[in-house]
Regions:
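Catalytic binding pocket for nucleotide-activated donors in carbohydrate/polymer assembly enzymes
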Residues: 333-405
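A charged, aromatic-enriched C-terminal amphipathic alpha-helix characteristic of glycosyltransferases
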Residues: 391-432
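Donor nucleotide-sugar binding/catalytic pocket of nucleotide-sugar-dependent glycosyltransferases
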Residues: 196-198, 212-264
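Nucleotide-activated donor-binding/catalytic signature segment of Leloir-type glycosyltransferases, i.e.
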Residues: 302-319
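Repetitive, compositionally biased segments used for assembly/scaffolding
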Residues: 70-180
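Conserved active-site histidine-acidic residue motif and adjacent donor-binding/catalytic loop
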Residues: 298, 316-327
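Conserved catalytic-core segment of nucleotide-activated headgroup transferases in glycan assembly
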Residues: 247-306
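N-terminal subdomain of nucleotide-sugar transferases
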Residues: 1-67
Length: 432
């Protein structure tokens, strides 16, 4: 199965997690020029840079192992690392996300006055994949893509728009632009018997010519899809919609990730853009056996930081995507108690990860949550609901089943059956 999208997004992440949970093998093609990819991911550039399994082996390059000219040296100031030629700084090294590992993400090469003239990109396997050449104004001129042997394989003349494939056959291919290159890459990687889930509507006319009978479109929203539905075999919707808003002819995926095997753990989480979380301090004191994980994409205000000394409170200011996914995995409770806007679709992410959504009628971010068994009219009722959860062994599975029924989440077995039939080419009965 091949997923095609312009770039990684919440929707592609959800779809990949769903397929992983089903054990369905897939590949992903992003129609961008990313070169730091895993083995299941292809981009327009990586399709030229990576050619064997060996290319996906290795570790990020430790900064001190970076090759530099004789007598040049690396000099570190905290997390900032420079390359010196003995007199002047000739480059700066940008480290990968985990700064403690001190591995190389980019090298910015300097000209006169430390003006950046070129940028080298390094991948997670420790080799250079790209060099960008800049003009005197810092504008990109050319992107040069390399294979593991550091041979030039693709040139992208950015301002003119065209690209040159410097393949091993000794004969250059010229592409007039990104669309021309995309067609060539699709021809190269598509398998004749492979179903496609496409998230880029601009590619549908091209894909209709190459894979007309097993073409599925996937969108976050169900709005404005009428013209697309007529061009594909099936349409998947990743976001949640209440039953009364759903439209015929569409397959809704929200909730299909639930495997029904999660056991209750006394871990509660909330993602907030506001320091005002109704009743949080009282819950923290009333239920010392519950760990409260409070996350934000930015810094936190004093109403939250003052809780940091509590042994059952864990704060995550500026939370990373990896930390967020880990909280979703290990928590069983989501607190929809924060005022202000909902951060992304965090409540839906929590529900899809089999969290019980606890909240007040005055704080929940979606009106249809008010009918859930763990949404209450008062704080006192909310506290009592927490006590029931901790004292009654069957409360969590029963309330979770009720939550799923009220929200009419997708049935996992039906989605699995659909995807299985899609893989097996039984397209005459591909519907739910």
């Amino acid at each position: 199965m091949l997923i095609i999208a312009q770039e990684p997004s919440q929707v592609t992440d959800k779809l990949r997690r769903l397929l992983d949970s089903f054990g369905i093998q897939y590949r992903v093609l992003y129609t961008n020029f990313e070169t730091d990819v895993d083995k299941a991911t292809i981009s327009l550039a990586s399709s030229f840079s990576y050619s064997s399994d060996e290319d996906y082996k290795g570790q990020p390059l430790f900064f001190n192992d970076l090759s530099v000219p004789l007598y040049w040296e690396l000099w570190t100031l905290g997390i900032t690392t420079y390359i010196f030629d003995g007199q002047d700084r000739r480059a700066s090294i940008i480290l990968r996300e985990n700064l403690k590992d001190r591995t190389v993400k980019q090298v910015h090469w300097f000209g006169q006055g430390e003006k950046v003239l070129a940028i080298d990109d390094y991948n997670r396997y420790g080799w250079r994949t790209k060099q960008r050449l800049l003009d005197d104004e810092g504008q990109a001129l050319i992107d040069i893509y390399f294979n593991r042997n550091q041979e030039e394989v693709l040139l992208h003349y950015i301002q003119e728009g065209y690209l040159i494939d410097q393949g091993s056959e000794g004969r250059d291919r010229i592409f007039s632009g990104k669309e021309d290159l995309t067609k060539a890459v699709l021809t190269q990687i598509l398998k004749s018997d492979e179903p496609i889930i496409c998230m880029d509507s601009n590619l549908i006319p091209i894909l209709q010519l190459q894979q007309p009978n097993r073409l599925v479109y996937c969108s976050a929203s169900h709005d404005g899809l009428e013209h697309i539905q007529n061009q594909v075999n099936h349409t998947l919707i990743a976001n949640y919609y209440p039953q009364e808003e759903r439209r015929s002819g569409l397959i809704y995926l929200a909730g299909a990730e639930q495997e029904g095997t999660k056991t209750f753990t006394p871990q509660a989480m909330v993602m907030t853009a506001s320091e005002n979380i109704e009743g949080l301090a009282g819950l923290v004191d009333a239920f010392p056996n519950i760990d409260f994980h409070i996350a934000a994409q930015t810094s936190m205000g004093p109403k939250l930081t003052c809780l940091e000394g509590k042994v059952n409170v864990h704060l995550y200011p500026g939370i990373s995507q990896e930390q967020y996914q880990e909280l979703l995995r290990k928590s069983s409770i989501y607190l929809d108690l924060n005022y202000g806007s909902e951060v992304s679709d965090v409540t839906l992410d929590a529900i899809e990860n089999e969290h019980l959504l606890y909240g007040l009628e005055s704080t929940v971010h979606r009106p249809y949550y008010k009918t859930l068994p763990t949404v209450y009219a008062s704080y006192e009722e909310l506290e009592q609901g927490f006590r029931q959860l901790l004292q009654q062994a069957d409360f969590y599975p029963n309330a979770l089943a009720s939550q799923k029924e009220i929200l009419r989440l997708a049935e996992r077995e039906e989605i699995l059956a659909f995807l299985t039939r899609l893989e097996e080419e039984k397209d005459d009965d591909l519907h739910l």
